[in-house]
């Protein structure tokens, strides 16, 4: 496996069940949202992105694939999202932390909306010399440390492709 394979990673997350409520923060045009919505066929997925064009592209894909369990939210995660406290079973933050200025604010907001025992999957660039956003890459150990400040406990870690690390936390 070279680059990320969202469907394969989602299929391997044994804690997911079809009735869950999930949130894909930094959804872009749906690389994670679509396979997640299919997996959670009796649940719901919030797709959150700061870019209207990305959500518009995602809306078209959802319409084309006749996927109806996704709600699109235009929001800046660093300023908060309009999702109630303790309502989300599962959050995906894929390639988000390296992009944002205030990583702790993103983790605090994730912790706020997660239910007790909810899971947070963080996938981000490994620090490598030759590919990805190396100047902004975050160290896996720093993410684990920051998450612990918000009572997010590391449950699992794995490589997700050659260029990314994956961490699963529980609230």
Tell me what each language-model feature is:
Residues 2-20:
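Conserved alpha-helix/loop element of class I SAM-dependent methyltransferases that forms part
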Residues 104-116:
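A short glycine-rich, Lys/Arg-flanked "PGG" loop and its adjoining helix->strand segment in the class I
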Residues 136-150:
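Short alpha-helix
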């Amino acid at each position: 496996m070279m680059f990320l394979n969202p469907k394969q990673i989602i299929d391997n997350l044994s804690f997911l069940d079809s009735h869950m409520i999930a949130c894909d923060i930094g959804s872009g045009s749906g690389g994670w949202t679509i396979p997640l919505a299919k997996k959670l066929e009796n649940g719901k997925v919030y797709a959150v992105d700061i870019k209207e064009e990305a959500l518009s592209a995602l809306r078209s894909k959802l319409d084309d694939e006749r996927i109806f369990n996704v709600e699109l939210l235009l929001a800046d995660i660093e300023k908060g999202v309009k999702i109630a406290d303790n309502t989300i079973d599962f959050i995906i933050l894929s390639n988000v932390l390296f992009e944002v200025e205030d990583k702790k604010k993103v983790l605090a907001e994730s912790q706020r909306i997660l239910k007790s025992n909810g899971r947070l999957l963080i996938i981000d660039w490994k620090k490598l010399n030759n590919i990805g956003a190396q100047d902004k890459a975050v160290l896996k150990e720093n993410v684990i440390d920051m998450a612990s400040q918000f009572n997010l406990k590391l449950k699992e870690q794995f490589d997700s492709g050659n260029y990314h690390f994956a961490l699963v936390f529980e609230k």
